[in-house]
Amino acid sequence: RQQPFVPRL
């Protein structure tokens, strides 16, 4: 499944 693009700061 595709994961949402969430850049971790």
From Swiss-Prot:
One of its GO terms (cellular component) is extracellular region. It comes from the Eukaryota. It is found in: Secreted. The keyword Secreted applies. The keyword Lipid biosynthesis does not apply. GO terms for molecular function: neuropeptide hormone activity. Its main location: secreted. GO terms for biological process: neuropeptide signaling pathway. Keywords: Amidation, Neuropeptide, Secreted. InterPro entries: Pyrokinin_CS. The modification Leucine amide is found at residue 9. Potent mediator of visceral muscle contractile activity (myotropic activity). Belongs to the pyrokinin family. This is Locustamyotropin-3. It comes from Locusta migratoria (Migratory locust).
